Amino acid sequence: MYKLDFYTAISNRNDPKTLNHFERVSGYGQVVRTPRGREIEFGFDKRSDGWYVTDVASGMRIPKKYDTRMKALAALNAELLSKVDKAVENDAYKAVVKALSEFKTNSEVA
C-alpha cells in the first residue's frame, strides 16, 4: 500500500447521471489484479464511521464500510474483483470515468 490522493464520487447511487460531483480525499492506494488479469487501482480512505474502498479510475465507491484498512483490503476477494472487472467494460462505468476526467480538468482550470 502507498499514500494516495484520489477522487470519490459524491452520491449514494451508482448512476452515471448523478455521478458528476466528486471530492478529493487522501488515503492509501493498492493495485490489485483481477482473476481475468486486469489491474485495477483501489483507494482506501478513512471516514469517521469506517474505511471505504473506491475504484480510483472512476471514483465509484464500493457500497460497504469496513472497520479497518486491512479488512477493506481483504474484502477485495475473487468474487468482488470479478464484479468490478465486468463493470469496467460497461457503458455506465465509462461514462463515470469520463465525468471524473472532466471534473479533474475543470478543477485544475479553476
Question: What is the predicted function of each stretch?
Answer:
Residues 1-2, 101-110:
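Short intrinsically disordered terminal tails
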Residues 39-41:
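Short Gly/Thr-rich strand-loop-strand
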Residues 56-70:
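A short, exposed loop/beta-hairpin motif centered on an aromatic-Gly-Thr core
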Residues 66-83:
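A short, charged, amphipathic alpha-helix used as a generic interaction element across diverse proteins
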